Amino acid sequence: MKIKNKEKGQVSIEALLLWAALAGMIGLFTPAFAHAMDAYTLHAHTNQFISFSETLQETISGISFAAPGTQTLLQVPPIENMTIEVSGNEIHLTLAHAQLAHDKKRTITSAWPIEGTLTPGEKIILRREEGKITIQ
């Protein structure tokens, strides 16, 4: 069966209309999909932030009562918008994001002064020394 020129044109127009409808549907759902992915990423970062703060609190508590010279290795997760400040006997963790109603804040306390810095995405060594805890 041969397709005539007029029918070829009709098939081409129908194919273009189908492709245009498909592109329109993709364009319609892309923003909704992007928003869902942003919400999922924020939820994952928040859970990771809470988990890390609990792990850090347990580690600091354990090493605070250990003998001088005791050390442990800890991975600081690379969480976007997380700030870490070390001040005296406390480590202040903050997760700030425009979609959060309030910043998530955690304070880790120690029986000893803490010296050093924590950088997101790096491994650190917590070492109990005489009268203090150092972060390397």
Regions found by a protein language model. Give the residues of each.
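C-terminal juxtamembrane segment of a hydrophobic transmembrane alpha-helix
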Residues: A15, A20-T41
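N-terminal leader/signal peptides at the extreme start of proteins
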Residues: M1-K8
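N-terminal export/assembly leader peptides and their processing motifs that target proteins to secretory
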Residues: P31-Q136
